[in-house]
UniProtKB/Swiss-Prot annotation:
Domain of life: Eukaryota
Active site: S119, D174, H208
Organism name: Homo sapiens (Human)
Lineage per the UniProt record: Eukaryota, Metazoa, Chordata, Craniata, Vertebrata
The encoding gene: LYPLA1
Activity: how regulated: Inhibited by palmostatin-B, leading to impair depalmitoylating of Ras.
Keywords: Acetylation, Cell membrane, Cytoplasm, Endoplasmic reticulum, Fatty acid metabolism, Hydrolase, Lipid metabolism, Membrane, Nucleus
Keyword rRNA processing: no
Name this protein carries in UniProt: Acyl-protein thioesterase 1
Amino acid sequence: MCGNNMSTPLPAIVPAARKATAAVIFLHGLGDTGHGWAEAFAGIRSSHIKYICPHAPVRPVTLNMNVAMPSWFDIIGLSPDSQEDESGIKQAAENIKALIDQEVKNGIPSNRIILGGFSQGGALSLYTALTTQQKLAGVTALSCWLPLRASFPQGPIGGANRDISILQCHGDCDPLVPLMFGSLTVEKLKTLVNPANVTFKTYEGMMHSSCQQEMMDVKQFIDKLLPPID
């Protein structure tokens, strides 16, 4: 997946129970792997959808005293005005676009692919969807933020995904990525894409994690946008 890091293992995959006619690519958070999310999607799967949960390359993370861990890009700080790893974010987005291209080669059109992620992975999924020329079905962005927000226009984006459907979810007790980040992100997203297609759901008492209700909302979003076609 990552041309610059051949040691990254192959993604965790929940294969479709029959011929795959759609796919979900979901990116884990900092320090995690794709395995836990693959298990979560196995619990809400639909038989015609393939779920792909790639693993981030291991790299030193400034926020964590340069300790090496799975990370899509470097995180320097968690405050709204922290410096961002612009080149790392852009390279990571290119790697995800290559993964989407691979699925298109495998026979799944890009408009039958939903991109998503949790925390750092959710941030990367939003950035990738808003900058790619591949028309996607939607984005499911959990407990996250929009990286490099100043790089986006004041008005709507051009390109393939100006009408993309976005489900953004956040816990109202998140101590790591505060709910305010989610609220600011959703307001920005509504200026970049058709605001009628942006949904923001919050979960009472949820911290920086997921919950059963959220996963059911994610399933409903996926199944609505990626219905069976045969």
